[in-house]
């Protein structure tokens, strides 16, 4: 945290930012290793000017670390968080420390970057556009455009994940259980 250029804001908080560039990238994702982050701190991710800003509060990062540990990860693997995809060849990570926190309390690194050759929106546009095989589906395939399947059709979602520095886009289905527990079950292909 000491090597950043910190600016003190009127409310006593401090903010600093660092940008990463990858020539030819359509989008980037930053792999952030948050080893120590003061309570109340906020990470912000954004691309080019006018791009939406995505915030990740320290509490959210702590919850993600616990989820990762519950899934069997430990150490740096549990602390690694992938930021959102930001359009363009540049991505900025901004850190805001709350009033009373010091940069010495921050241990943060960006050891990985995923260089996307197309944005997630561009990749999503290509899903399901192959019309050459219309009519070749098996008899067990159901046309969800039929009136009786409209509710089920709204349960399809996309998932973006990064593994080993490569970013993937998959689709899946949101599932409910018979207890209506509101547990967010997501069923996808094994390779996802």
Question: Where are the predicted features?
Answer:
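Domain-level representation of secreted and single-pass membrane ectodomains enriched
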Residues: 1-166, 170-192
């Amino acid at each position: 945290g000491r090597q950043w250029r910190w600016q003190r804001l009127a409310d006593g908080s401090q903010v600093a930012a660092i940008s990463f560039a990858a020539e030819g990238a359509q989008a980037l994702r930053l792999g952030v290793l948050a080893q120590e982050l003061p309570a109340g701190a906020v990470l912000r991710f954004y691309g080019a000017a006018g791009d939406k800003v995505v915030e990740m509060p320290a509490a959210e990062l702590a919850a993600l670390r616990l989820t990762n540990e519950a899934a069997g990860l430990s150490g740096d693997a549990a602390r690694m968080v992938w930021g959102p995809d930001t359009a363009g060849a540049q991505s900025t990570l901004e850190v805001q420390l709350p009033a009373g926190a010091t940069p010495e309390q921050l241990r943060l690194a960006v050891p990985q970057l995923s260089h996307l050759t197309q944005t997630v929106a561009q990749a999503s546009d290509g899903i399901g556009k192959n019309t050459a095989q219309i009519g070749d589906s098996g008899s067990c395939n159901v046309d969800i455009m039929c009136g009786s399947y409209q509710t089920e059709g709204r349960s399809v979602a996309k998932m973006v994940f990064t593994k080993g520095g490569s970013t993937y886009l998959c689709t899946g289905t949101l599932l409910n259980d018979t207890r209506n527990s509101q547990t967010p079950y997501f069923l996808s292909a094994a390779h996802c």
